[in-house]
Each structure stands twice: as C-alpha cells, then as structure tokens.
C-alpha cells in the first residue's frame, strides 16, 4: 500500500472491508459503480487527484487505489474535522466528505472492527 496519513494496518482493514482485499471488479452501489480493492467510485477518484491512467485501472491496482485513499484523506479528513485515526478515515471513506460526522457510517466502522486483526486499529 501507499504511505501517507492512513496507517498500513488501517488501509488493510478498509481494503478487507470493501473487497476482502481482492480486485473484485466493479459493482453497482447506491446508484453508481464502485470498483476494485477499495470499491472506489469515479467521483472519489477525481477527488483524490486522478492517480494512474484511469479510474478503473487505478481501482484495480492495490497500490494506486491505496494512493487514492491516502490522497483523499489528506484532502478531506482534516478539513472535515475527522479524528486523524482509523475510525475517522474509515468513516470518511464510507461516507465521503464529512463522512466521519454522519451517523450512517457508524455501522461501517463497527463492522470493520470485527474483521480479524482490525479490532482497535488506529
């Protein structure tokens, strides 16, 4: 995974939560496609600075997709006032800008912590 403000362990847990940390291709989710290891939507990829050659090819690369997550968190997590630890990052990943403040992302965080090796992840 790419380095950045999100710890490697946290990235691994988000990856496991989204796809079992496999390139699972694209799936329709809430009216738009989510792709790859981190189930990245095209708008998220644009917000993370469009790394790689295209949205779908980046999402299909664990390194590029993790770089996108790192860039997204650098852009939004602090701005949104999220706690700069895994809970804030995971909820932001799930809920978009200001996702860490949305009640709808609490269940995502609780499910992520039940993944083997992810309880109490920072």
Curated annotation (Swiss-Prot):
Please state how the activity of this protein depends on pH. Optimum pH is 6.5 at 37 degrees Celsius for bacteriolytic activity. Optimum pH is 3 at 40 degrees Celsius for chitinase activity.
Recorded catalytic reaction(s): these are: Hydrolysis of (1->4)-beta-linkages between N-acetylmuramic acid and N-acetyl-D-glucosamine residues in a peptidoglycan and between N-acetyl-D-glucosamine residues in chitodextrins
Xref: Gene3D superfamilies: 1.10.530.10
User: What UniProt keywords apply to this chain's record, in alphabetical order?
Assistant: Antibiotic, Antimicrobial, Bacteriolytic enzyme, Disulfide bond, Glycosidase, Hydrolase, Secreted
The top EC class is hydrolase
Which GO CC terms are listed, alphabetically? extracellular region
Compartments, record wording = Secreted
GO BP terms in the entry: defense response to bacterium; killing of cells of another organism
Show where the I-type lysozyme domain sits: 3-118
> Which residues does substrate bind?
41-47, 72, 93-95, 102
Entry-linked PROSITE patterns: LYSOZYME_I (PS51909)
| Enzyme Commission (EC) number | 3.2.1.17
Q: Which cysteines are joined by disulfide bonds?
A: 10-86, 13-118, 15-21, 26-35, 48-68, 58-64, 82-100
Kindly identify the residues recorded as the active site: 18 (proton donor), 29 (nucleophile)
Could you tell me one molecular function GO term of this UniProt entry? lysozyme activity
Which is an annotated Pfam family here?
Answer: Destabilase
Its function?
A: Has bacteriolytic activity against Gram-positive bacteria M.luteus. Also has chitinase activity.
Per UniProt, subunit arrangement is: Monomer.
Q: What else is known?
A: Unlike Ruditapes philippinarum lysozyme, catalytic activity is not affected by variation in salt concentrations.
Family label: Belongs to the glycosyl hydrolase 22 family. Type-I lysozyme subfamily.
What is the designated name of this protein?
A: Lysozyme
Source organism: Meretrix lusoria (Hard clam)
């Amino acid at each position: 995974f790419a380095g950045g403000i999100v710890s490697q362990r946290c990235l691994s847990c988000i990856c496991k939560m989204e796809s079992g940390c496999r390139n699972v291709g694209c799936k329709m989710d809430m009216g738009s496609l989510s792709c790859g290891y981190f189930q990245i939507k095209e708008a998220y990829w644009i917000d993370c600075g469009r790394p790689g050659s295209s949205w779908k090819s980046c999402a299909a690369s664990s390194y590029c997709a993790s770089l996108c997550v790192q860039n997204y968190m650098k852009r939004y997590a602090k701005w949104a006032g999220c706690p700069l630890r895994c809970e804030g990052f995971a909820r932001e990943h799930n809920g978009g800008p200001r996702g860490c403040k949305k009640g709808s992302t609490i269940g995502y965080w609780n499910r992520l912590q039940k993944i083997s090796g992810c309880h109490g992840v920072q």
